Swiss-Prot record:
Top EC class, one word: oxidoreductase
Enzyme Commission numbers on file: 1.8.1.-
Record key words, sorted: FAD, Flavoprotein, Oxidoreductase
Gene expressing this chain: Pyroxd1
Textual note on the cofactor: Binds 1 FAD per subunit.
Family, per entry: Belongs to the class-I pyridine nucleotide-disulfide oxidoreductase family. PYROXD1 subfamily.
Protein name in the entry: Pyridine nucleotide-disulfide oxidoreductase domain-containing protein 1
Protein function: Probable oxidoreductase.
Disruption phenotype: RNAi-mediated knockdown results in failure to emerge from the pupal case and in lethality.
MF GO annotations: NAD(P)H oxidase H2O2-forming activity
Amino acid sequence: MSRKCEFLVVGGGIAGVSCAESLAIYRPNASILLLTESSIVKSVTNLVPVARYLHKFDVREQDVSEMGASFQTLVDRLDHINSREHCIRTKAGLEIKYRYLCLCTGGTPKLFSGKVVNPLVIGIRDTDSVQLLQRKLATAKDVLILGNGGIASELAYELKDVNVHWVVKDSHISATFVDPGAAEFFHIAMNECNAKDSSPVVAIKRMRYSEVLPKEQTNNHGAALGPDWHRSVDLSGAREGEENRLPKIYYKSRISSVQDLADDAGAIVKLEHEDGSFQQLTCDFIVSATGVWPNTDYTCDSPLQFSDDGGISVDEMMRTNLVDVFAAGDVCTANWPAAMHWFQMRLWTQARQMGSMAGRSMAAASEGESVYQDFCFELFGHVTKLFGYPVVLLGRFNGQDLGRDYEILVRCTRNKEYIKFVLQNGRLRGAMLIGNTDLAETCENLILNGIDLEPYGDDILNPDIDIEDYFD
């Protein structure tokens, strides 16, 4: 069996769907095929500007049959790429000829157990793995979470009726996104909210997912979770009456060994702390949330060029080293000279941006035209929520790659806001806005325009001075 298309996009996550949608806009009459491993795909909806170049959005889960007529879909799995002949083979044996190919195959969870399959260790990444988590939680009383990123941070405080042991390698929580000061802000807020049995006021809300179950019950690699994924699922354990129990956090620690107990009674976990001491815990299962590896579980007739982190190397047009083969999202690594205020993080925001850019680039190539890289790659920006608070991250928000030649200004109002400016040579290089995100557009302008802020000194964050009046 074989079929033919002009544009073939592999992957049903945000990057893949964004690429296909972008192609449908620029080449509405072209044949576009989206190849996805799961019948459930993810698309961006309710796109709302937070600043001129920064947007917040919802992630919608839907069945491929609901995608509309702008492009075709096929539920199957990529097995082999024949770049010379411009065709691919799927796991089901179908041959698909293409003119342009975009790989948006996402990432697979990094499990501390490595390639060894352990039923007591699960990685949270897609809808299927969340269902597995729910099933295990139903009979669990003690759960260990390993990791310090967004998913680990959400899980640690969202799990109910269960003892949570949270193991982090850093000296503060949520180190992927925030600094120790912001981590302390969150820690205090969560403790006090727990004591009052209330939730923090949320200024930005997203629609919750409606639960959509895939038709196929296989081990297929589904699309990554988006924001607020945990809001629509029951994350309750078997310790009834202990709903508001706070997680016990083990800082600067790692798992040394895991010993399975008999009769599926869980595991004994040995932790090693930074000072060399050891501690033993017992848990029903382990959630490994330590990031993702680029998913390149397919073969190719010509070797793809990979970066050091395992991602497919792409240039500013999202092109790989193979002719007419592009890549976008978690599976790729940006291999172009980065702009002054931008760097790559494997987030749904950049998945959307890269997917859209790949689609625009492919459409231009098909018509013999050239395009410029999208301006979103001039400034890092991400909108999310952590512990119920809206969060906006801009530029080098944690001083990334600035060495030690920068200063930080912070304004913090307990349980309300945490605002941080990163300045270098009097210029704003990055900003972190938690709770109060009204300054997002002003910060964006200050970073991009390189305005000298030295004359304003510390007053730049004085709550009695409206800096928006100065820098609109």
